[in-house]
């Protein structure tokens, strides 16, 4: 008997030990997922508490009984190595699996037993070898994305079992051989991407008619051969990219009325396109037929009125005149290089106001370059023609701010000014320097923005040698101080040469110093304008020596100034005043990284400057201020003393400061939902679309800006890393009214994506209630902040009482209550209870107002 008790006591001890060590019951979905994370290198401290109920973990969604995982999202979690057996392969009810953006190298043998899967995303990993024919087990699969891996061998014929498949992405791998005939069994496909592989052979017979719902097809970058008739029966196609293959025949059979994007470049298509342009081409927005064997004369393009991108370069067209394109009013990109054009470049090109790229190089064009006063033009190539005469001043004046230009191998004349020898050899080879004796020697020196009248006065003065008149004009106009109404401040050559530091500037809350000797020797980097030679001297001029009149805000990271850089670039200049532990090179590397992060809902970082120990970030200016001002009726430019209301940017009119007030676009449910969804998308991109993920750390209403189209843009992302370890806790952890509960504990962890989720929840509450996070009237004396007030109402099923009266009658009250419930989820006390931002985006999309709201 004693032995029996000892045995059962030991068994009980072992059971408790196992439960404590694994934190989940063995052979449960929670156990399998926790083992998966642990063996793939993810620890409990990385936003997961393995002792908590598994259905509360980030990225996990369970069935209604909280017994089985039906969705697992682990994108960008730095998972590495081979997925072990007896982990996720045991999730018998799993419907959706997203393991994208990791370093996974191989799949387990039991992976193919997940026969309930509907969505599988393994993209952007390092999985190699052949793709198993066991994929045929996934009969319910609707989305399969294994792009950007190292798969090789043949695409398995077993794909014919995927009868429910709608989206197939196998691009950017090493798949070989031909496209399997089994693919034709997937008749529900809407999108196919097999691009950037090593596929060869011809398309299976009946390929064009096999997919009646197909809208998107990309076969680019393979060695597939076939004819235009292979695509004749695609009735629903809107996007077609077959570039870089071996297709031939006429392009006639390719075009359908539904087609909007067509890239047929780098193939062997033949024939005359002028006789083939008909109604099937009318929906085209993007057309690339470059590097084929097309012939005839280019004409009839005026029918393609929706076209934005046109590339016909490197074909075998007969010699002909420049085609009429002035009717293509939306054209942004035009490449007619090496198309055997003759005659003149028509001056009507100036009517293409949206044109950004013009390439007519390698032709037989003669005559003068017309005056092209196209505001958006950033690239021009007219090289290797027979052009003569002066390069128009309207073009020369734009060159310092262009991304690419080439006038070489013509008979043009121009004034070389201050162009470097390298630029002269590369872009003006064969042209003649025509500078008159009195020409402006600084024509191409990057200068501060001045008014049009001043530019004209200086140009006239310097080109006529009337020194006395020039001196008078310079005295009258050359030294005006830049003010808020747009007047310009300029410095004489003598004054400019005397600009030397160190420089000290003061605001109400801080004094900052730029310890540099010569302002014009400190470069300013503008990411998308590499030819601009801007210096710290230009920043001084743009901000009137960082004058208080140009101060927009005195925020947490430092003061923000408004200014215009050379080229009319409207910017907000943020001085990062807190000491950084990073070297200049490390800080520059961090800023360069942030400059590469692009998203429609992020304020773009356009450049930076390292001035001594001072780091300066340069942002695109946001015309419509920030959300805090818009919601709480503050005039643009007004700074309040509360820390959570800093970083306000202003908007001016000729009559002074403008106040949008409550009657503007903000007073509708549709607009506020748009702001919420855009901000959520920005955060989801930072958390899940960047590698490594970026934690914002200070999401608040005043960090959400509105561009000229009233689209929301999140600012200040990633700035904390520029300081290294030089920031104190108060700055790292956010602003009063937005602080997550975990940051109020004596010993708390560093910010995580879930702390951003909490802050977003507060912003969502602001949008729905119109109230500030703290120090507002919450209609209940017991509540001292917005979060506790709204959460209390939601718990009592009285969420409608919190809705801002200004928007209550502008849409569905049910949708507005759902938005408050989403905010409730985001502001949960425990980080593990909060959804991810990807999930928040999905929830907000589910309550998107209809078009008539």
From Swiss-Prot:
Binding site for ATP: 552-560, 574
Glycosylation site list: 49, 121, 150, 241, 300, 335, 340, 386, 406, 411, 425
SUPFAM superfamilies per record: L domain-like, Protein kinase-like (PK-like)
Signal peptide: 1-23
Principal subcellular localization: membrane
Keywords: ATP-binding, Glycoprotein, Kinase, Leucine-rich repeat, Membrane, Nucleotide-binding, Phosphoprotein, Receptor, Repeat, Serine/threonine-protein kinase, Signal, Transferase, Transmembrane, Transmembrane helix
Family as reported in the entry's similarity comment: Belongs to the protein kinase superfamily. Ser/Thr protein kinase family.
Record localization: Membrane
EC number, UniProt record: 2.7.11.1
Recorded catalytic activity of this chain's protein: L-seryl-[protein] + ATP = O-phospho-L-seryl-[protein] + ADP + H(+); L-threonyl-[protein] + ATP = O-phospho-L-threonyl-[protein] + ADP + H(+)
Protein name: Probable LRR receptor-like serine/threonine-protein kinase At2g24230
Phosphothreonine modified-residue sites: 535, 543
Phosphotyrosine: residues carrying this PTM: 619, 738
Organism listed in the record: Arabidopsis thaliana
First and last residues of every LRR repeat: 91-114, 116-138, 139-162, 163-186, 188-210, 212-234, 235-257, 259-280, 281-304, 305-328, 329-352, 354-374, 375-398, 400-421
Active-site feature positions: 698
């Amino acid at each position: 008997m004693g032995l029996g008790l000892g045995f059962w006591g030991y068994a009980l001890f072992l059971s408790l030990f196992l439960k404590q060590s694994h934190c989940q019951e063995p052979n449960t979905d929670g156990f399998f997922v926790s083992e998966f994370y642990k063996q793939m290198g993810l620890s409990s401290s990385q936003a997961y508490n393995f002792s908590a109920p598994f259905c509360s973990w980030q990225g996990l969604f369970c069935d209604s009984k909280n017994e089985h995982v039906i969705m697992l999202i682990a994108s960008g979690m730095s998972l590495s190595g081979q997925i072990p057996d007896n982990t996720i392969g045991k999730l018998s009810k799993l419907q959706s699996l997203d393991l994208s953006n990791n370093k996974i190298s191989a799949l387990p043998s039991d992976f193919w037993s997940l026969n309930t899967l509907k969505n599988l995303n393994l993209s952007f990993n390092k999985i190699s070898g052949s793709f198993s024919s066991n994929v045929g087990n996934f009969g319910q699969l609707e989305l399969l994305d294994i792009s950007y891996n190292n798969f090789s061998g043949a695409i398995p014929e077993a794909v014919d079992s995927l009868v429910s498949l709608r989206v197939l992405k196998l691009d950017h791998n090493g798949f070989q051989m031909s496209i399997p005939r089994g693919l034709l069994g997937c008749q529900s496909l809407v999108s196919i991407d097999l691009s950037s592989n090593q596929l060869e052979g011809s398309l299976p017979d009946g390929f064009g008619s096999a997919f009646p719902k197909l809208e998107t097809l990309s076969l680019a970058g393979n060695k597939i051969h076939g004819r235009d008739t292979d695509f004749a029966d695609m009735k629903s196609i809107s996007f077609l990219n077959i570039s870089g293959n071996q297709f031939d025949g006429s392009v006639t059979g390719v075009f359908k009325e539904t087609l909007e994007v067509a890239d047929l470049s780098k193939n062997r298509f033949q024939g005359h396109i002028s006789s083939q342009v008909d109604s099937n081409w009318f929906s085209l927005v993007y057309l690339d037929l470059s590097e084929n064997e097309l012939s005839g004369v280019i004409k009839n393009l005026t029918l393609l009125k929706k076209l934005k991108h046109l590339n016909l370069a490197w074909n075998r067209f007969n010699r002909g005149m420049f085609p009429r394109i002035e009717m293509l009013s939306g054209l942004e990109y035009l490449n007619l290089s090496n198309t055997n054009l003759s005659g003149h470049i028509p001056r009507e090109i100036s009517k293409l106001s949206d044109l950004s790229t013009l390439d007519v190089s390698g032709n037989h064009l003669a005559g003068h370059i017309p005056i092209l006063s196209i505001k958006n033009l950033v690239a021009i190539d007219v090289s290797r023609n027979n052009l003569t005469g002066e390069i128009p001043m309207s073009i020369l004046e734009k060159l310092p701010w262009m991304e690419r230009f080439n006038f070489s191998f013509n008979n043009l004349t121009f004034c070389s000014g201050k162009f470097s020898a390298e630029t002269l050899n590369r872009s003006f080879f064969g042209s003649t320097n025509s500078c008159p004796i009195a020409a402006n020697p600084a024509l191409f020196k990057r200068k501060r923005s001045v008014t049009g009248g001043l530019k004209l006065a200086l140009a006239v003065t310097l080109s006529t040698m009337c020194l006395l008149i020039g001196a008078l004009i310079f005295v009258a106009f050359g030294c005006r101080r830049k003010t808020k109404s747009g007047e310009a401040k300029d410095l004489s050559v003598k004054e400019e040469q005397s600009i030397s530091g160190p420089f000290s500037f003061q605001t109400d809350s801080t004094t900052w110093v730029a310890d540099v000797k010569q302002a014009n020797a400190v470069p300013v980097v503008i990411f998308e304008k590499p030819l601009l030679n801007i210096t710290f001297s230009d920043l001084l001029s743009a901000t009137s020596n960082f004058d208080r009149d140009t101060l927009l805000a005195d925020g947490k990271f430092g003061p923000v100034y408004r200014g215009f850089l050379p080229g009319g670039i409207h910017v907000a200049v943020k001085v990062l005043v807190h000491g950084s532990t990073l070297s200049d090179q490390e800080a520059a590397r961090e800023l360069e990284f942030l400059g590469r992060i692009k998203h429609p809902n992020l304020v773009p970082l356009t450049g930076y400057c390292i001035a001594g120990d001072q780091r300066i970030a340069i942002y695109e200016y946001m015309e419509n201020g920030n959300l805090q001002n818009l919601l709480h009726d503050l005039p643009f430019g007004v700074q309040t003393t509360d820390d959570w209301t800093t970083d306000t940017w202003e908007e001016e009119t000729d009559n002074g400061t403008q106040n949008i007030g409550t009657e503007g676009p903000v007073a509708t449910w549709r607009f506020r939902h748009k702001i919420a969804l855009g901000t959520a998308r920005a955060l989801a991109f930072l958390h899940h679309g960047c590698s490594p993920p970026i934690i914002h750390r200070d999401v608040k209403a005043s960090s959400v800006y509105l561009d000229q189209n009233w689209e929301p843009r999140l600012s200040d992302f990633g700035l904390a890393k520029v300081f290294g370890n030089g920031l104190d806790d108060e700055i790292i952890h956010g602003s009063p009214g937005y602080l997550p509960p975990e940051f109020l504990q004596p010993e708390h962890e560093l910010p995580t994506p879930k702390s951003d989720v909490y802050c977003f929840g507060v912003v969502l509450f602001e949008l729905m209630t119109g109230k500030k996070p703290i120090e507002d009237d919450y209609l209940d004396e017991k509540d001292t902040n917005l979060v506790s007030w709204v959460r209390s109402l939601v718990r009592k099923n009285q969420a409608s009482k919190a809705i801002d009266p200004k928007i209550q009658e502008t849409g569905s009250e049910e949708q507005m209550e759902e938005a408050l419930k989403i905010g409730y989820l985001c502001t949960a006390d425990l980080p593990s209870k909060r959804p991810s931002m990807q999930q928040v985006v999905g929830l907000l999309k589910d309550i998107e107002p209809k078009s008539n709201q």
